[in-house]
Amino acid sequence: MAFSDYKHIYQVQTDYQIEYQEDNFLIIAEYNPSNQIIAELEFNQKNIDIFSSEAARCETIIFPILREVYQNYAEKTALWIQKSIAYDEKLNGTPDYMISKRSPLGKTMLELPLFIIVEAKKNDFEQGWGQCLAELVAVKNMNGRDKQSIYGIVTDGKLWEFGKLVDKIFSKNSDSFILNELSKLLGALKFIFDEVTKEIV
């Protein structure tokens, strides 16, 4: 069974006894986008059919936005694209994007995963969260730290939803964020990067 076989959150809840709740755990300070990201997104939206496929959304929207914030944390963290992970026969697969602790051995070594980003296939957020929560459970078990917050994001490029798993409790942030409010979206990402880098010893 792979992460993508989980189509709904309740399937992961049933298999792993995960409690579900909603609250606003993100503390947002608006982030001033760089001229580079503004120009890149404007160019892409003007010249490319950015919503024509999953690959188009990932390459022209999702990755540039992640990179915009990630570059400020590159000394401590590593950004992975389509990096396969496996905890056991049921919890395995390939997250779209993953942030981990940066290994002292270099960028080719995967250290503790810190958060996961899932592209919502066919704009299906319900399935996206089923897959994302399965990935969060795998990461929590791989890390062996029940009390550590593991963050997840599900996005179709336009809409960004956030969640976190702590021990057996999954919290979905009540507020979501949209591409057209870029500074708030980047602020939400910055909050998560700030939180996960606190976990790095």
Over which residues does each language-model region extend?
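A generic "binding-loop/recognition-motif" signal
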Residues: K158
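A short, conserved, highly charged catalytic patch centered on acidic carboxylates
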Residues: A2-F3, Y16-Q21, L26-S149, E161-V201
